[in-house]
């Protein structure tokens, strides 16, 4: 039985390595990286806090998407990418077949995803064996942005910009219901410019100094929301797969400024500018 089990766990590892090879080939063809997320890189970009101990929990294996320090040894599906992990991987796989109870793994939670601190091979074997859940000691790290299991490394730059935007505007505190998502790399920088310009003209209109919070709240209520409401009502977003309401908000204002500069048209109220953009799109 021992020889049979040894052969089985060796075959399991070789199969997992071959799957990792196929994933790598697909990633080259599709130009979509399959690497695990690096906790340190996420921490640096998103300036996350913590960690705070949350106890032992049962965690979905597919919500574990990154690693503290072994993100080069496994791919995004937690398949082993190096033969050096063979002995440890097969040892954990053997424990699976022998129904040995292993200690909980250690995870950092950030948003809706988890990063492995200790227990990479146990996660890898669990996924390969079709296990949906795993016991883990969880420590949660605070973040101002929501992170989901579909997060990619290339998304970090925009999310980092969003963190900077929220730290400078406190929009998530002023408007807890505001959930601005962007796919445009410089989108949040442009929104900061919009708020600064809005604050300037508010000061001229009201003949007084405008606080940061007042400017942010007024911009959101009188500029951003009116455009987004028109976008939602028109259902035009479905014509732009992969784009967001905030992306279209930027396009509406780009179109507005284009008409003003190239055709000399006067600037329109936000909601009218949005309807004008949609009408142009339908022509």
Where are these regions (language model features)?
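Short, charged/polar connector segments at secondary-structure boundaries
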Residues: 1-117, 128, 177-189, 207-282
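A short, basic-hydrophobic beta/loop patch
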Residues: 99-114, 121-152
């Amino acid at each position: 039985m021992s020889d049979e089990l040894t052969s089985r766990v060796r075959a399991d590892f070789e199969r997992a390595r071959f799957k990792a090879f196929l994933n790598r080939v697909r990633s080259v063809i599709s130009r979509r990286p399959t690497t695990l997320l690096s906790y340190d890189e996420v921490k640096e970009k998103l300036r996350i806090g913590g960690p705070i101990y949350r106890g032992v929990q049962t965690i979905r294996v597919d919500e574990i998407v990154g690693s503290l320090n072994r993100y080069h040894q496994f791919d995004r599906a937690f398949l082993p990418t190096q033969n050096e992990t063979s002995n440890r991987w097969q040892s954990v796989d053997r424990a699976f077949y022998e129904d040995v109870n292993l200690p909980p793994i250690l995870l950092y939670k950030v948003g809706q995803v988890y990063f492995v601190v200790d227990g990479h091979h146990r996660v890898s074997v669990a996924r390969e064996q079709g296990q949906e859940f795993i016991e883990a000691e969880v420590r949660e790290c605070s973040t101002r942005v929501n992170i989901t299991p579909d997060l990619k490394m290339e998304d970090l730059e925009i999310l980092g910009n969003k963190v900077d935007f929220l730290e400078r505007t406190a929009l998530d505190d002023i408007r807890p219901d505001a959930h601005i998502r962007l796919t445009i790399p410089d989108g949040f920088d442009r929104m900061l410019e919009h708020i600064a310009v809005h604050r300037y003209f508010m000061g001229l209109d009201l003949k007084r100094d405008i606080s940061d919070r007042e400017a942010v709240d007024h911009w959101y209520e009188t500029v951003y929301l009116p455009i987004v409401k028109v976008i939602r009502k028109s259902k035009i977003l479905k014509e732009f797969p992969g784009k967001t309401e905030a992306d279209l908000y930027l396009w509406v204002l780009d179109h507005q400024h284009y008409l003003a500069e190239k055709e000399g048209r006067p600037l329109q109220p936000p909601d009218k500018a949005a309807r004008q953009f949609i009408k142009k799109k339908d022509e």
